[in-house]
Amino acid sequence: MSLKEKTQSLFANAFGYPATHTIQAPGRVNLIGEHTDYNDGFVLPCAIDYQTVISCAPRDDRKVRVMAADYENQLDEFSLNAPIVAHENYQWANYVRGVVKHLQLRNNSFGGVDMVISGNVPQGAGLSSSASLEVAVGTVLQQLYHLPLDGAQIALNGQEAENQFVGCNCGIMDQLISALGKKDHALLIDCRSLGTKAVSMPKGVAVVIINSNFKRTLVGSEYNTRREQCETGARFFQQPALRDVTIEEFNAVAHELDPIVAKRVRHILTENARTVEAASALEQGDLKRMGELMAESHASMRDDFEITVPQIDTLAEIVKAVIGDKGGVRMTGGGFGGCIVALIPEELVPAVQQAVAEQYEAKTGIKETFYVCKPSQGAGQC
């Protein structure tokens, strides 16, 4: 049973009438451009065919009823006439409440809604299940009430909800790609202007995501430290962000910087350049060059930004040994565990899966999870 059929069926059972619309918003994987988002740089994600699906219908009052199919059909209910505050027990409900609350601040011309939510974006794998939920809820209200909001505004609304209502710091990439993703394309995003450019993906290439299942413990504290180090670097160059520093300017004075800050800055500057070049390599179907750029990105994250762990490095090495120069592989996400992403010719996927199954657990004691994805369409009706 598809997520659409599942949510429509649950909706009719729970609320006693059929849903009028079914909306989806996808998760994402970032192909290249790591920790560049909060430095006003470039990222190159694609939406994936794992998504959050919501069957819904407008109400003729100001009540919102939401059922979470993946949390034992828990039901949340709140009114648009009262101040929206956090739910005491249901964390999932706060993503919904936050999106609705921030949407009210943007455009209050919507009424009540009934929703049933289900998704298959793996949680805790760094594939943006939360952004996919935020964008899905925003799209529901935009579609049901014909709100004059574009994808970028729905994305910004989701980011605000996560930062200010849920209380998690995040950049804008995850929500933007979920809202604006294009089938068979990646999206080059300028995190300063929020400008986007669709980049066609070569035919016959699979997007493979492998979760190391190494439990991330340092990610919060280390993320904040990296952010501070980047801000220190920008201040040294008297620029608003590292986006504004050239590699030539850096090389001329690198010896004057604190050695650790210098390494962090070098990663951001080289990663930005790699990301822009990767977009044109992909567009030209040059998988060999894309693979080189992904390998350089991984080495930079390992040696300069120091956010990989041995388990992730092992996983990347196993994949690289199979694909050679026919594709690319690197860690993706915040670091200290999580996933690797690989661009692999479809005919090599079984060999990669077999090599990883035979070697990764033997070397690390952890069993991986393997996802084969397609670059998918952003949020909309399904």
UniProtKB/Swiss-Prot annotation:
Which Gene3D superfamilies does UniProt cross-reference here?
3.30.230.10, GHMP kinase, C-terminal domain
Any one GO biological process = galactose metabolic process
Q: Pfam family example for this protein?
A: GalKase_gal_bdg
Q: Which residues bind Mg(2+)?
A: 130, 162
Q: Which residues does substrate bind?
A: 34-37, 223
GO MF annotation terms:
ATP binding; galactokinase activity; magnesium ion binding
Q: What is its EC number?
A: 2.7.1.6
First-tier enzyme category under EC:
transferase
Q: Which SUPFAM superfamilies match?
A: GHMP Kinase, C-terminal domain (SSF55060), Ribosomal protein S5 domain 2-like (SSF54211)
Q: Taking the first listed entry, what is the main subcellular location of this protein, grouped into a coarse class? A: cytoplasm
The entry's localization annotation reads: Cytoplasm
GO CC term, one of those recorded: cytosol
Q: Which residues form the active site?
A: 174
Q: Which UniProt keywords apply?
A: ATP-binding, Carbohydrate metabolism, Cytoplasm, Galactose metabolism, Kinase, Magnesium, Metal-binding, Nucleotide-binding, Transferase
The similarity comment for this entry is: Belongs to the GHMP kinase family. GalK subfamily.
Protein's recorded name: Galactokinase
Phylogenetic placement of the source organism: Bacteria, Pseudomonadati, Pseudomonadota, Gammaproteobacteria, Enterobacterales
